[in-house]
Amino acid sequence: MEEKKKKVVVAFSGGLDTSFTVMYLAKEKGYEVYAACANTGGFSAEQLKTNEENAYKLGAVKYVTLDVTQEYYEKSLKYMVFGNVLRNGTYPISVSSERIFQALAIARYANEIGADAIAHGSTGAGNDQIRFDMTFLVLAPNVEIITLTRDMALSRQEEIDYLNKHGFSADFTKLKYSYNVGLWGTSICGGEILDSAQGLPESAYLKHVQKEGSEQLRLTFEKGELKAVNDEKFDDPIKAIQKVEEIGAAYGIGRDMHVGDTIIGIKGRVGFEAAAPMLIIGAHRFLEKYTLSKWQQYWKDQVANWYGMFLHESQYLEPVMRDIEAMLQESQRNVNGTAILELRPLSFSTVGVESQDDLVKTKFGEYGEMQKGWTAEDAKGFIKVTSTPLRVYYANHKDEEV
């Protein structure tokens, strides 16, 4: 009786490493290979079709696209907007957040089909190996994790030669730059990125400046969620994000260089272009300045910073993340209205807001103008009381110079 083949789910992106993994496990190890592409919004329909065709050519017995774009928005992107999350005040955590949901989808699929193993193409140098492995260890604890790229330490050329030898050819030419294109931005690695003193040339970006002059962009939020772009309403938040990306990318908005610490402790540098995240977060933060109290903004910033860090550090499944999400969700109850931005090549600025929850418009008075909610004597009394701790301190430390 023929021995039953073991099932392996390969997290398949269509790139060199995962292509090699599919073929090697099918041919050399005798696995029944299930190629699964977890899409968080970064793949086009054409790319997914090519992935399917190639997976079967490489030896997979089955190919599936696991579309988790809506889940990615509902369980991650939404909260990153609520928290105005930018890692180190710069990077919208594009790749980090996507990887977690890709791993979740792969783990669920592996459990569903009763897989014996899960394979992915991460190297031993980056963050992704941690994000994938940790998720699989938690959600598919009895499934073996296979990482040929990490364990066999093969060069790109060795992988290409192996594929060619077995009749599979594709354009795996190593370009100067490598890109990770996603719904929440595109990361750029390689080339000048490897030199701390250099920036990226225009040619390195996938989206180029197409517009001159300036225009206004109106982004409307309801309870913190983007609902309209230039007064065009969207029921699907993904389509709203894509619309903002289309408008902002034409001006080359959202380009920057992120320098941060990897999970394993080394510093890394990555270029990125992320028009939609930077515009949406910029508009949302601006609207919050009008609609939230001082302490709501302060404490939300603290927990949002932790949320972004935990997301990056592969701690999405940590229970405290659900607690932080609950706080962020509740903080948005009055974040309603339209933020107006001015777009121009490579930059944008804030203009104003229209909101029924605007706390700047108040019967108590306007900053720097005539007060209406208190008298001059009230103001003087408030100032005197507020100064009490300082007056007490310096009365007891008259020798201190200031």
Which positions does each model-derived feature cover?
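Nucleotide-activated chemistry modules centered on ATP-dependent adenylation/adenylyltransferase
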Residues: E2-A11, L16-V402
